[in-house]
């Protein structure tokens, strides 16, 4: 059985697996795919969950909440490629279920790409799943941004970039720092 609400609940083989729960419930195996706020429980003092050490540490830094990392022999953590520490979870039983929160199939400086896995059921987030969402080539956009930054700073200007605080800002920062001619400085 798969149930939406309070994250995603998958019940199989007499166990309850809860992916990205909003509320922590007893007697369930909780999994947190990554540390973006829309994938975290809204309130808890402490909890046990299957997640990466990076995700645990980010939650501690962002929310000052403690998570004890646990494991389960039926659950395999796989790279999701979304942000540092992001994971997909493959639950094996009579049926195999693969859950992904956000994922990325492109290698990035701070993450490994998500790789396809065989499964019976795939549960995925589809924030931009509609055909109307077509994005330009990532490397091309990053190149344009680096050129723009170098041009601004080369004219003794000051550029301020806005990006999501967890994920995009690190990606932009790493990309800009790795360009051939440094363009970042304190403004």
Label every PLM stretch briefly.
Residues 180:
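Active-site ligand-binding patch in enzyme domains
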Residues 183-187:
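Long, charge-dense
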Residues 19, 176-177:
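Surface-exposed amphipathic alpha-helices with a cationic face
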Residues 170-175:
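A short acidic (Asp/Glu
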Residues 2-25, 29-163, 167:
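His/Asp/Glu-rich metal-coordinating catalytic cores
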């Amino acid at each position: 059985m798969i149930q939406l609400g309070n994250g995603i609940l998958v019940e199989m083989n007499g166990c309850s697996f809860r992916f990205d729960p909003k509320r922590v419930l007893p007697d369930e195996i909780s999994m947190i795919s990554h540390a973006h706020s829309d994938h975290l429980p809204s309130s808890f003092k402490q909890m046990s969950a299957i997640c990466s050490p990076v995700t645990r540490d980010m939650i501690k830094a962002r929310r000052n909440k403690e998570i004890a990392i646990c494991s389960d022999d039926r659950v395999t953590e796989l790279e999701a490629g979304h942000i540092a520490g992001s994971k997909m979870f493959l639950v094996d039983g009579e049926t195999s279920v693969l859950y992904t929160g956000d994922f990325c199939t492109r290698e990035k400086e701070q993450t490994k790409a998500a790789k396809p896995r065989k499964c019976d059921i795939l549960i995925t987030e589809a924030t931009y799943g509609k055909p109307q969402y077509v994005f330009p080539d990532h490397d091309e956009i990053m190149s344009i941004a680096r050129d723009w930054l170098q041009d601004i700073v080369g004219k003794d200007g000051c550029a301020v970039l806005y990006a999501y605080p967890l994920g995009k800002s690190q990606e932009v920062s790493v990309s800009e720092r790795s360009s051939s001619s440094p363009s970042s400085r304190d403004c």
